[in-house]
Swiss-Prot record:
Palmitoylation is critical for proper membrane localization and signaling. This is Guanine nucleotide-binding protein subunit alpha-13. Residues 287-294 are annotated as: G4 motif. It comes from Homo sapiens (Human). The gene is GNA13. One of its GO terms (biological process) is regulation of blood pressure. It is found in: Cell membrane; Melanosome; Cytoplasm; Nucleus. Keywords: Cell membrane, Cytoplasm, GTP-binding, Lipoprotein, Magnesium, Membrane, Metal-binding, Nucleotide-binding, Nucleus, Palmitate, Phosphoprotein, Transducer.
Length: 377
């Protein structure tokens, strides 16, 4: 009977895997699982839409990223909102210190001389304390300074200094928070969605946010825009689908915080010229966001862009004329005018509905261009 039994070698040929040891079977299972994972990852990477947010410091990149979380993510729960409270308190104290210092340097008299003591109190704030150095202020500390801040903001001297803010560096959201001191001073204060959008903390390093729209994976990458942070940009250039280049359109009359000499719009134009003419991005759709339209609309009423850009033609107090000029300034930075079209949008990053509508159009543009690239591969 034994003569009719097939040998082990015949069995292994006829039924591979039947005689595998438990260790070999486990190894084979793991190998198949790894192959599946690699296949899924390859499919994911091929479908992934990687969007790079670029632009000079304070152009609105981080605010735009917050909006993506609000619109396409899980929004900010109570715990996440509370984490912004120390940053907001820091924004207020830093902003008031800037105004007190500016009032003195601009030789603006106090409306009420007794506010000098409040000004001295603000300037004595220890900015080198551990939390303050990180751009955060505890509730307990903020409440100690709140009466002084409230008195100073009501002083005509500080108000006059604020009116001349283009002559020094002041955060754009300072007025919003100073106008809401009562809310900020409540013991159970929890930042609102608008508070979070206006809270300012400089971006250090690289921040990514992943989300899906109709089963299409998106990865949005925000890199610091200050000069010291731009060397990190090159770390993010791999496999980029699209670049959203943000510009603070209202800053045509302001200078950089870094050197206090270079015009901010000129700086943005120079950065854009480097990006748009880089061969690495020859197949990447570049979309220009002329941001802070709300502030630009206010500014053109009182400041003439022609005083800063002599080549401007048109009505300097007409928003549409100024916006048309800004678009042309950026278009003219492209050396190859025959390359892919330059898309542009006028945005207000703190306005959720505006960003929702704009990004809907941007998403369609990106996906359309991405599909064309995939078909050419």
């Amino acid at each position: 009977m034994a003569d009719f039994l097939p040998s082990r070698s015949v069995l292994s040929v006829c039924f591979p895997g039947c005689l595998l040891t438990s260790g070999e079977a486990e190894q084979q299972r793991k190998s198949k699982e790894i192959d599946k994972c690699l296949s899924r990852e390859k499919t994911y990477v091929k479908r992934l839409v990687k969007i790079l947010l670029l632009g000079a410091g304070e152009s609105g990149k981080s605010t735009f990223l917050k909006q993506m979380r609000i619109i396409h993510g899980q929004d900010f729960d109570q715990r996440a909102r509370e984490e912004f409270r120390p940053t907001i308190y820091s924004n207020v104290i830093k902003g008031m210190r800037v105004l007190v210092d500016a009032r003195e340097k601009l030789h603006i008299p106090w409306g009420d001389n007794s506010n000098q003591q409040h000004g001295d109190k603000m300037m004595s704030f220890d900015t080198r304390a551990p939390m303050a150095a990180q751009g955060m202020v505890e509730t307990r500390v903020f409440l100690q300074y709140l009466p002084a801040i409230r008195a100073l903001w009501a002083d005509s001297g500080i108000q006059n200094a604020y009116d001349r803010r283009r002559e020094f560096q002041l955060g754009e959201s300072v007025k919003y928070f100073l106008d809401n001191l009562d809310k900020l001073g409540e013991p159970d204060y929890i930042p609102s969605q608008q508070d979070i959008l206006l809270a300012r903390r400089p971006t250090k390093g690289i921040h990514e946010y992943d989300f899906e729209i109709k089963n299409v994976p998106f990865k949005m990458v925000d890199v610091g825009g200050q000069r010291s942070e731009r060397k990190r940009w090159f770390e993010c250039f791999d496999s980029v689908t699209s670049i959203l280049f943000l510009v603070s359109s209202s800053e045509f009359d302001q200078v950089l915080m870094e050197d206090r000499l270079t015009n901010r719009l000129t700086e943005s134009l120079n950065i854009f010229e480097t990006i748009v003419n880089n061969r690495v991005f020859s197949n990447v759709s570049i979309i220009l966001f002329l941001n802070k339209t709300d502030l630009l609309e206010e500014k053109v009423q009182i400041v003439s862009i022609k005083d800063y850009f002599l080549e401007f033609e048109g009505d300097p107090h007409c928003l549409r004329d100024v916006q048309k000029f800004l678009v042309e300034c950026f278009r003219n930075k492209r050396r190859d005018q025959q390359q892919k079209p330059l898309y542009h949008h006028f945005t207000t990053a703190i306005n959720t509905e505006n960003i929702r509508l704009v990004f809907r159009d941007v998403k369609d543009t990106i996906l359309h261009d991405n599909l064309k690239q995939l078909m050419l591969q």
